[in-house]
Every structure is written in structure tokens, then in C-alpha cells.
Design a protein with these regions (language model features):
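Rossmann-fold NAD(P)-binding glycine/threonine-rich loop
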Residues: 71, 189-228
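Conserved acidic residues
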Residues: 53-54, 180, 203
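Glycine-rich phosphate/diphosphate-binding loop of Rossmann-like nucleotide-binding domains
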Residues: 1-25, 87, 91-183
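Short, acidic/small-residue loops that bind anionic groups at enzyme active sites
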Residues: 76-90, 205-210
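General beta-strand structural signal in soluble alpha/beta enzymes
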Residues: 31-32, 57-60, 81-84, 115, ...
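N-terminal ligand-binding/catalytic initiation module
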Residues: 1-81
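Short, ordered loop/turn segments at secondary-structure junctions
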Residues: 34-35, 60-63, 84-87, 144-145, ...
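A short, aliphatic-rich alpha-helical micro-motif
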Residues: 50, 108, 175-176, 196-199
Length: 228
């Protein structure tokens, strides 16, 4: 997205989410923007609000801090804690993936999935896609340092290590060959037309980077009329 733009600049986004809660679920919400970067202090602040609210929806906390914040709040609080960037994105991607695989006539157990991005949203999506039947050995993760492979040390953490693969490929351009699915949760323009050409028949492309997608739909269709 736009990166760390501060709590004041995020307020219109939070207010917009509040409108969606009210319109589609009839839930009244309060948007609360907190000017705090220390994860432990953030947990203390949010936990202290429990007597006032019935649930907490976390928004726009960077990885890996978001995993710690959510985990600690769930331990301490007796009300539901939901991280929108992780679980909201994962639910949407999971539903879309089920339908896309049906349309493409592909089996989740045999597809090759390549993801660009290894932040909170991407890792949450992959966690749900595992439960929907895509095997871990068929999932290839890329980030700013390239392919997440066994033995890599740069920009690695425990969550990425789970998806490390034994592969000689080091770049998105290499690993995308014969991929059935591209899941983009990274940055605009990273998926090139030449990469789309190298994907398997009836490729499924989720270009979800915000505000600019990894590739535009018209660019995909210009090189692959069988793409979904």
C-alpha cells in the first residue's frame, strides 16, 4: 500500500471500514487510530479498551508485529480479536480461489501456486489455502529478496521458513514457469507479460496489491486469452 503514513492519515480509511460494517452487517463501530509503534505498548493500549467494546478489528499493522499483537491480544482478551489485513483478505482469496479452480478445471491438490509477497496478508492467505487443499510442497513464495528457498538467510523469519522450498529458482521470473496460480500481495507492476506467458494453461491470476496491482487485467489478456 502506501506504507507507514501515520495514524492521522489512516483515519479516512478506518472510517470507511466503519461504514462497511454498518451497511453490510448492521454493526456500529468506533474507529480508533493509535499513535504507537511499539508492539508491546500497542497490546497494552488495546487490551485496556476491553470493557468498552464487544470485539476488536485490527487494521494496517505491519508483519511480523501484527502476528505478535494479535496473538497476545487473544491471550489477554475475552472478546473476539480479528486482523482484517490477514483474515479478511484470506477469506476473500479463499472463496475466489475455490471458484477460480472450478472455472479453470484444476485440482487444488495438483496446482502450482506462486505468491509475490510474504507479509501478513500473504501468509494468512497461504495458511487458509493449505486448509483448502493446496499442498505446502506446491506453494512457492517470493519477496523482496526473491524466492524463499531452503538455506536462505536474507529477510527470513519463522513464518517464511515454513514455506522454504528446495529449488534452484531465485527470482519470480524463474519460479513462475508452469505455475497454475499467481497470488500477488506485494507491489504494483512486479508481474510482467513475459512471466504470464510462461504460466500453465488457464492460469489463475490474483493481482491484489493496493493501490496498484502487480499487473493490469488488460495486460494479462493481451498475452493470455485463457487466463482467469
Amino acid at each position: 500500500g502506501l506504507g507507514d503514513i501515520g495514524p492521522l492519515a489512516s483515519k479516512p480509511v478506518m472510517e470507511g471500514k466503519g461504514v462497511l460494517f454498518k451497511k453490510f452487517a448492521g454493526v456500529d463501530v468506533f474507529d480508533i487510530e493509535i499513535d504507537e509503534k511499539d508492539p508491546a505498548k500497542l497490546v497494552d493500549i488495546i487490551a485496556s479498551l476491553e470493557p468498552t467494546f464487544g470485539a476488536i478489528n485490527l487494521e494496517d499493522i505491519k508483519a511480523p508485529d501484527c502476528f505478535y499483537v494479535e496473538r497476545e491480544l487473544r491471550k489477554r482478551m475475552k472478546i473476539p480479536v480479528f486482523h482484517d489485513d490477514q483474515h479478511g483478505t484470506a477469506i476473500t482469496v479463499g472463496a475466489a480461489m475455490i471458484n477460480a479452480l472450478k472455472v479453470a478445471g484444476k485440482d487444488p491438490k495438483t496446482v502450482k501456486l506462486v505468491t509475490s509477497g510474504a507479509g501478513a496478508a500473504a501468509l494468512a492467505c497461504l495458511g487458509l489455502l493449505l486448509k483448502l487443499g493446496i499442498p505446502r510442497e506446491n506453494i512457492y513464495v517470493t519477496d523482496l529478496a526473491g524466492v524463499v528457498y531452503e538455506g536462505r538467510t536474507e529477510l527470513m523469519d519463522e513464518d517464511k521458513q515454513f514455506f522454504a522450498q528446495n529449488t534452484p529458482a531465485r527470482t519470480l521470473g524463474e519460479i513462475i514457469e508452469d505455475a497454475d496460480v499467481f497470488l500477488g500481495l506485494s507491489a504494483g507492476g512486479v508481474l510482467k507479460k513475459d512471466m504470464v506467458r510462461k504460466m500453465a494453461a488457464r492460469p489463475i491470476i490474483f493481482a491484489l496489491a493496493n493501490p496498484n496491482p502487480e499487473i493490469l487485467p488488460e495486460d494479462v489478456k493481451s498475452v493470455r486469452d485463457d487466463a482467469i
